[in-house]
Curated annotation (Swiss-Prot):
Protein name (database record): Splicing factor U2af large subunit B
Region span, Disordered: 1-195
Major site of localization recorded for this protein: nucleus
Biased composition (Basic residues): 146-156, 164-188
Length: 589
């Protein structure tokens, strides 16, 4: 280094020396060693700091890793929660879908069931309507058959009279037209049209005009004692003599007789002459002088004839001619199929006069009305107060009679308590005997058997018919109680069946028919028709119809007017019913 002189130089030297000294200090070994230590310490500290920093960094990194791990765990937990939530949502949706499907299936099942039930109801309704239509058609066919049978019978008589008088032909034509119109109108009700005399009786009774019965015979075929009243007897309403019964048309059914088994050579004129002469010979012309026969119709193919007499009494006398010989051939004399014994009893006697001189024509006095033969029935033990009409009603519960004879005292005319009868259908004979024999009638017990001993017992297939007949006899006994009086209740039997009453529409129609028909005879208070139980348990009174009237006068007219009528092809039996049993709802016999 450059050296300076003087003071100034001295300063300069001093400064330089100071720097040298300073440099000397710095460059001294101690100083270097200290510096080295410091540096080492600094490095150590720096290393520690660095290590701490590293440790802190590592801690921070660890914390961050832990935080990240926690975050991942939390995220996973949230993911699991979200997944569970989504699963729950999916389960809820599936449950809702299942519920919707179940509801849809249930609703579909309900609709299917409703449709099936509707179809079943429609099928049932169709079947019921079809059954009702079939039942109504059957009733209409039955009525039409009866109408055609009556029309054929009337037309046969008219065809024969047509040749005699054109005027009478026109009259018959008008009568036939009226009859056809009546036949059509009757289809509106289950009841048949009442015969003309019954309609007139109803009309007269409804108007309160009961004509008096004449005390002397003023009309052919009628006589003063045709309505005897015996004390203690139950007759119901007194038979009324209608105006129409005085005409030929109204009494024709009771004035005709059937003659079967005619010889091939017989004709209308020969038959008419023969029976007129025979009636005169036996004393059967009770209507006065002249021919008893007014008309004859012959069916040559079937060899039978219908012979029409002047009066009801003469027709009954002609019934005693059964078996008479006509041109060498024995002929059968019977009542025609349209003969109504209940109505005929109000027009005149229904049995031959017991004083006829049958021996004058070669017949025995015992051959009254076809009562001979193996099927003749003896009916004994009859109460003396029983009338002929009552006994016939009892016997005809089993079928129409071919002949009947109530034996009476010749002097007094009173019943001797026994009778004979023959049924048109011989198969009914044993059934009637078995059902009637032993029945109590008042203070008497009936004895009913074949008049010829050795009667055949009922066949097994007849047992059901026998049971039914016994039930009907029990009903008939209600009418024949001695000293009894008519009640306000009329019971109709043999009217309807249990099947008819199960259908509501059919039941309503039957109820309406009964109200309309029953109301014609008086003040009808109520109609009771017991119906069968749906569970098929026995129901008392099923098959019967009970008519309640305000007074006995109405019930008496109804009983007389409806007994023997036809309803739906069945013949009605009308009897009085005890008022106390009816009030208690007891409809059993």
């Amino acid at each position: 280094m450059m050296s300076y002189e003087g003071n100034g130089d001295g300063v300069a030297i001093s400064t330089e020396n100071h720097n040298e000294n300073y440099i000397s200090l710095e460059s001294s070994p101690f100083h270097e060693d200290s510096k080295s230590r410091e540096s080492h310490d600094l490095k150590k500290d720096s290393s520690k700091i660095s290590e701490k920093d590293n440790e802190n960094g590592r801690d921070k990194d660890g914390n961050k890793d832990r935080d990240r791990e926690k975050d991942r765990d939390r995220e996973k937990s949230r993911d699991r929660d979200r997944e569970k939530s989504r699963d729950r949502d999916r389960d809820r949706e599936r449950s809702k879908d299942r519920q919707r499907d179940r509801h849809h299936r249930d609703r579909h099942r309900d609709r299917s069931r409703e449709r099936s039930e509707k179809r079943d109801d429609l099928d049932d309704d169709h079947h019921r309507r079809s059954r009702d239509r079939d039942r109504r058609r059957s009733r209409d066919r039955d009525r039409e058959v009866r109408h055609r049978r009556r029309s054929r019978s009337r037309s046969r008589s008219r065809s024969e009279r047509r040749s005699r008088s054109e005027h009478r032909h026109k009259s018959e034509h008008r009568s036939r037209s009226r009859s056809r119109s009546r036949s059509k109108s009757k289809r509106r009700s289950g009841f048949d049209m009442a015969p003309p005399d019954m309609l007139a009786a109803t009309a007269v009774a409804a108007a309160g005009q009961v004509p008096s019965v004449p005390t002397t015979a003023t009309i052919p075929g009628m006589f003063s004692n045709m309505f005897p009243m015996v004390p203690g007897q139950q007759l119901g309403a007194l038979p009324v003599l209608p105006v129409q019964a005085m005409t030929q048309q109204a009494t024709r059914h009771a004035r005709r007789v059937y003659v079967g088994g005619l010889p091939p050579t017989a004709n209308e004129q020969s038959v008419s002459t023969f029976f007129s002469q025979v009636m005169s010979a036996i004393g059967g012309n009770t209507a006065g002088p002249g021919d008893a026969v007014v008309n004859v119709y012959i069916n040559h193919e079937k060899k039978f004839a219908f012979v029409e007499m002047r009066s009801v009494e003469e027709a009954s006398n002609a019934m005693a001619l059964d078996g008479i010989i006509l041109e060498g051939v024995p002929v059968k004399v019977r009542r025609p199929t349209d003969y109504n014994p209940s109505l005929a009893a109000t027009l005149g006697p229904s049995q031959p006069n017991p004083n006829l001189n049958l021996g004058a024509v070669g017949l025995s006095s015992g051959s009254t009305g076809g009562l001979e033969g193996p099927d003749r029935i003896f009916v004994g033990g009859l109460p003396y107060y029983f009338t002929e009409v009552q006994i016939r009603e009892l016997l005809e519960s089993f079928g129409p009679l071919r002949g009947f004879n109530l034996v009476k005292d010749r002097e007094t005319g009173n019943s001797k308590g026994y009778a004979f009868c023959v049924y048109q259908d011989p198969s009914v004979t044993d059934i009637a005997c078995a059902a009637l024999n032993g029945i109590k009638m008042g203070d008497k017990t009936l004895t009913v058997r074949r008049a010829i001993q050795g009667a055949i017992q009922p066949k097994p297939e007849q047992e059901e018919v026998l049971l039914y007949a016994q039930q009907q006899i029990a009903l008939q006994r209600l009418m024949f109680q001695p000293g009894g009086t008519p009640t306000k209740i009329v019971c109709l039997t043999q009217v309807v069946t249990a099947d008819d009453l199960r259908d509501d529409e059919e039941y309503a129609e039957i109820m309406e028919d009964m109200r309309q028909e029953g109301g014609k005879f008086g003040n009808l208070v109520n109609v009771v028709i017991p119906r069968p139980n749906p569970d098929h348990d026995p129901t008392p009174g099923v098959g019967k119809v009970f008519l309640e009237y305000a007074d006995v006068d109405g019930s008496s007219k109804a009983r007389s007017g409806m007994n023997g009528r036809k309803f739906g092809g069945n013949q009605v039996v009308a009897v009085y019913y005890p008022e106390d049993k009816y009030a208690q709802g007891d409809y059993e016999d």
